[in-house]
Amino acid sequence: MVKYVVTGGCGFLGSHIVKCILKYAPEVTEVVAYDINISHIMTMWSSKLKVVRGDVMDVMALAKAVDGADVVIHTAGIVDVWYRHTDDEIYRVNVSGTKNVLMCCINAGVQVLVNTSSMEVVGPNTTSGVFVRGGERTPYNTVHDHVYPLSKDRAEKLVKHYTGVAAAPGMPALKTCSLRPTGIYGEGCDLLEKFFHDTVNAGNVAYGGSPPDSEHGRVYVGNVAWMHLLAARALLAGGESAHKVNGEAFFCYDDSPYMSYDAFNAELFEDRGFGYVYVPYWVMKPMAAYNDLKRKFLGCFGVKRSPILNSYTLALARTSFTVKTSKARRMFGYMPLYEWSEAKRRTKDWISTLK
């Protein structure tokens, strides 16, 4: 009898993790999807699934949710490089929220915590250049230009710090690892949905500024979910398997092709008949600066404006950043569950339903 709790379990990644556990982990007798925004549709997925409304900042509700759990997969957090949230909100949820999860796990005697981190703990950033086919030990001058990657870095360090901690003698010492996905795509991806609506509103034309020769690693959400399950199983198994994985961080990628952001989106939306226009950097740079200025000006009057294009996202889109997952393959046998052709088909099938 094994109980899993997935924080952020009704979100884009979290819901796919829940689905993956229900489908591929017959040893699991209960799954709790803990989320501030719950999905009533998910309640019909399985009798094993319990959907609980709760916030990682609510320690009492969180403690109740993880009580009796063997594994907690922590995906809850704010992913935001578009200034939809204040810096304080992002840091509070991503760092303090992670600490709350860790403390509740330790106090409840949870054996395993798998933390969803981000490649942005390492990069890319606006000053350090490209990172091509890099691994966890590849040198890179990490500079956190934005509060989001900074918060994920701090959260990852907290997870490392509390690895091996037990609430009392005789209670389980917490085993952990952190997974660092690249840009996640797939069914339910809000960024792809926003890209679709923005392109339709622009007359079915997408305007992009990522250089054609730049490359980024994008990873299918089903494979990210699969890696979380494999990592949790390795830690739960104990012995040499758990010893190798415990306290480690792993890049999370699959076999999706390395392309520029714009070229990859074009692959996914090829059946929608969109046109694509490359906008040179000398045009994009002042546009991004204008968006930054307008956002700050309107913010003085309490008006939120969060365009995808800003100086930070432009710099990221223009900086090649790709990773390898050989460490995860070596330490806990990760291989993508879905090949690129299947991941692309599934994503395109979902895109075809967008209106």
Swiss-Prot record:
Q: Per its UniProt entry, which superkingdom is the organism in?
A: Viruses
What keywords sit in the KW lines?
Oxidoreductase
GO function terms (MF aspect): oxidoreductase activity, acting on the CH-OH group of donors, NAD or NADP as acceptor
> Where would you find the membrane-spanning parts of this chain?
none
Biological process (GO) annotations? Answer: steroid biosynthetic process
Record PANTHER family: BIFUNCTIONAL POLYMYXIN RESISTANCE PROTEIN ARNA, SHORT CHAIN DEHYDROGENASE_REDUCTASE FAMILY 42E, MEMBER 2
Q: Which family does it belong to?
A: Belongs to the 3-beta-HSD family.
Q: What is this protein called?
A: Uncharacterized protein 052L
